[in-house]
Design a protein with these regions (language model features):
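Bacterial N-terminal signal peptides that target proteins for export
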Residues: 1-11
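A general, composition-driven signal for non-globular sequence regions
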Residues: 2-3, 17, 69, 83
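Bacterial Sec signal peptide processing site at the extreme N-terminus
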Residues: 17-39
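HKD-type phospholipase D/PLD-like phosphodiesterase module
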Residues: 22, 39-46, 50-82, 92-170
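Gram-negative bacterial Sec-dependent N-terminal signal peptides
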Residues: 9-19
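Phosphate/adenylate-binding glycine loop and adjacent helical scaffold
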Residues: 86
Length: 170
């Protein structure tokens, strides 16, 4: 009797996995394509970079930031200085102080007329993040998900049934 119940539960679990794997992604065919804006050499940041790069043809352009605080301050300063566009790509965005602070700065930039594009990995993005939902409502902001799960509410099932597809990284 116990082995029959275990078999029935296993069969029910297998059925749920198969049915969950049959779910398709949402239709995005009507969504407007988004492209980067032309080179921003005419902006204050662009001119500053050009001055720093003068005579540095072999420089990589990377400047390591050794602490999280340094990285956050640098991002916030860049957002404040942006004149035309901001393109962000994140694997993880949380509703913590850092996420809310960055969202507030991005909203301020969008209010100034700066186009803000945010690309998030769906695996590292919380469900129903109010700050991201609020940002996405702004006409100058686009929030997009990379590799969206077919069912965001049942992430566990999507990871089990579509692991090879949803486990890719940006």
């Amino acid at each position: 009797v116990a082995s029959v119940r275990i078999f029935q539960r296993g069969l029910a679990m297998a059925f749920l996995l198969v049915v969950g794997g049959c779910q398709s992604l949402p239709d995005n065919s009507g969504r407007t394509m988004s492209y980067t804006l032309p080179n921003g050499a005419d902006t204050r940041l662009g001119r500053g970079v050009a001055t720093l790069r003068a005579g540095q043809s072999d420089a990589s352009g990377f400047y390591p930031l050794s602490t999280g605080v340094d990285a956050l301050v640098a991002r916030l300063q860049l957002v404040q200085a942006a004149e035309h566009s901001i393109d962000l790509q994140y694997y993880i965005w949380h509703r913590d102080k850092t996420g809310r602070l960055l969202a507030a700065y991005l909203l301020d930039a969008a209010d100034r007329g700066v186009r803000v594009r945010i690309l998030l990995d769906d695996m590292g993005s919380p469900l129903g993040d109010e700050s991201l939902l609020m940002l996405d409502q702004h006409p100058n902001v686009e929030v997009r998900l990379f590799n969206p799960l077919s069912n965001r509410v049942q992430r566990f099932w999507s990871m089990l049934t579509e692991f090879s597809r949803v486990n890719r990284r940006m």
